[in-house]
Design a protein with these regions (language model features):
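Short, flexible active-site-adjacent loop segments at beta-strand->alpha-helix junctions, enriched
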Residues: 83, 112, 144
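Hydrophobic/aromatic residues located in beta-strands of well-ordered beta-sheets
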Residues: 27, 77, 105-106, 140
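Conserved beta-strand termini and adjacent loop/short-helix elements that scaffold enzyme active sites
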Residues: 30, 50-52, 109, 141-146
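Sec-exported extracytoplasmic/periplasmic mature domains
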Residues: 39, 43, 82, 98-105, ...
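Conserved SGNH/GDSL esterase-like catalytic core that processes O-acyl groups on lipids
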Residues: 23-95, 115-123
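Catalytic His-Asp segment of secreted/periplasmic serine-dependent ester chemistry enzymes
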Residues: 118-177
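Secretory targeting and sorting signals
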Residues: 1-22
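Active-site segments of SGNH/GDSL-like serine hydrolases
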Residues: 96-123, 147
Length: 177
């Protein structure tokens, strides 16, 4: 019995990459309170949703690493973070794209925000655009541009109303299908 188990343990501890056909299908969404408001709408469209109020972008690095290590990271990873003020570091975005690997697609969703914070919003969205340009497996979903002019989608400039939740979930669904 030991002779059979030992090689299996050695192979697993080396961390051999899973073949593309063994990656779980579907979409895994990581977000903060903005996505939290639309969790039911996204779940109804087939997303697995991992949200936490006030989550920062850098927290997504650990989430992606853990999910991948446990074989639970889906083929498509949607990240909508950056609303809460800590600027996105290029290294965090690069790490997420690298860890996801070439058989997965990472979708970065641009942020909206109250007009009193336009510099933060612009910086976050600019950093996401740059990351998407650097990595072949990473795409930008421009929620900021799509939602402009739809004040009735937000009750405070960033958090979603009922109408906004439907629009948000539909937009993410269309751009990740």
């Amino acid at each position: 019995m030991r002779k059979i188990l030992l090689p299996v343990i050695v192979i697993l501890s080396v961390g051999i990459a899973a073949p593309a056909h063994s990656i779980p299908g579907g979409r895994y969404a990581i977000g903060d309170s903005v996505m939290l408001g639309a969790k039911a709408n996204l779940t109804a469209r087939g997303f697995v949703v991992d949200v936490k109020k006030s989550r920062q972008f850098y927290e997504a690095v650990g989430i992606v690493k853990r999910k991948k290590a446990h074989g639970l990271l889906r083929r498509k990873i949607v990240i909508h973070l950056g609303t809460n003020g800590v600027l996105i570091r290029a290294s965090d975005c690069d790490t997420i794209s690298r860890v996801a690997g070439r058989h997965r697609r990472v979708f970065l969703v641009t942020v909206t925000g109250p007009t009193k914070y336009p510099k933060i919003r612009k910086a976050q969205n600019r950093r996401m655009r740059a990351c998407a340009r650097r990595h072949r497996n990473t795409r930008l979903i421009d929620w900021y541009r799509h939602s402009r002019g739809h004040g009735n989608w937000f009750y405070d400039g960033m958090h979603l109303t009922t109408k906004g939740r439907r629009a948000y979930a539909g937009y993410l669904d269309r751009h990740t299908s």
